[in-house]
Amino acid sequence: MEDTLSGEEGEEEEEEEPAPAPAPQDPVEPQLTEASQVLGASEIKQLSLHLPPRVTGHPWSLVFCTSRDGFSLRRLYRQMEGHSGPVLLLLRDQDGQMFGAFSSSAIRLSKGFYGTGETFLFSFSPQLKVFKWTGHNSFFVKGDLDSLMMGSGSGQFGLWLDGDLYHGGSYPCATFNNEVLARREQFCIKELEAWVLS
């Protein structure tokens, strides 16, 4: 009889006190593998609210940064090899302006444009402004050896970076109907980070 009672008690305990589940990660608080040199915690939290639900809760892994890896687009492509997940590009220019882009897939060399409508541009000027896909065209991301381009239309790019990742530009484009992301259409990069979100 004791066996039966203890068995019943054990069953009751399981129903009343299941093993505690790990506390869910706050989807607004991304887990970064290391500190960003471009954005602070407040900006990261604001930006994370605009990321697609499929990447919410995924850790942010710093795959490339100019302070560690140097100013080289080819090096950025090499660091991206083997990664397929979405990428967040964070930039700070010589004027201190912070801006960047979310790419739905890894940054890579390509003959044409690639990506999906999840891709967007953003700027902190000083408040966060996010420029999502308009549906007018599908010119999301294109990478060649001399430049990386995001968004296009009428011969202008929403964001472009040159091969040495030192100079860049931003112009209004049909893909995102964006404003100029930096204070000026042409800028010099002080720091660039590429975070894989997967």
From Swiss-Prot:
Question: What is the disulfide pattern of this chain?
Answer: none
Please state the span of the N-terminal signal peptide per the UniProt entry. Answer: none
Give the compositionally biased regions (Acidic residues): 1-18
- Specify the TLDc domain's residue ranges: 37-198
Its domain of life?
Answer: Eukaryota
Region called Disordered, residue ranges = 1-30
* Biological process, per Gene Ontology: negative regulation of cellular response to oxidative stress
Entry-linked InterPro entries: TLDc_dom
Name the protein family: Belongs to the OXR1 family.
**Per its record, how is this protein called by name?**
TLD domain-containing protein 2
* Origin species: Mus musculus (Mouse)
